[in-house]
Amino acid sequence: MCYLSRMSSQQMQLTISGFENRIKILEDLMNEFDSNLYIRLKRECDFKLPKEYDVSIHALTILMKRHLSNMEPIDCYQDLDTGTLQTMLIFCCTLRMIEHYEKSLSNINFFSLSNDLKRLEEYNTSCSVLLSLYQRQLKKISTTIESYYLADTLRHNQNILNLCERIYNIQKLLNKREKASVLRH
């Protein structure tokens, strides 16, 4: 990635555009996944165990490659290094997971069965861990990419802030439910 420092601003802009387009393509692909995405991800990798982080990243990569292999063309992904591809995968999966989780909130009564509440907390844990995976992966590759380039293409500061806010709002809902439950008893 050291060639980036030798690029002209026009070349840099084209490269940034290319990455943004790929991220958009990957996001669209993730959105095409069936509603059982959470179950499939859960089956292939355990989000809760820190020691499984690398295994989880590997499993996400396999999952996406399996999906991409049924589509044409796939050549545009060949020049992406593993770290960059994994980072984008984690970002897409984080977005998809949180969207799926938020949708489930509208169908659950906060005062209903304890297994519903357990499921909510499990979703929240998965979202949080995916986000930390994404941030950790960014930190890992930041040593090989110019900082301004990283900020413009991969960091997605605003997106990370939005994800944090959404996770925080979900946690607030869970806390509210817990307080209301205590008051009722």
From Swiss-Prot:
Record keyword Cytoplasm present: yes
Coiled coil ranges: none
Keywords, sorted A to Z: Chromosome partition, Cytoplasm, Meiosis
GO process annotations (BP): chromosome segregation; dynein-driven meiotic oscillatory nuclear movement
Annotated compartments: Cytoplasm
Cellular-component GO terms for this entry: cytoplasm; cytosol; dynactin complex
Disulfide bonds: none
Keyword Cytoplasm: yes
Domain of life assignment: Eukaryota
UniProt function note: Required for correct meiotic chromosome segregation.
Protein name: Meiotically up-regulated gene 5 protein
Originating organism: Schizosaccharomyces pombe (strain 972 / ATCC 24843) (Fission yeast)
Taxonomic path: Eukaryota, Fungi, Dikarya, Ascomycota, Taphrinomycotina
This protein's encoding gene: mug5
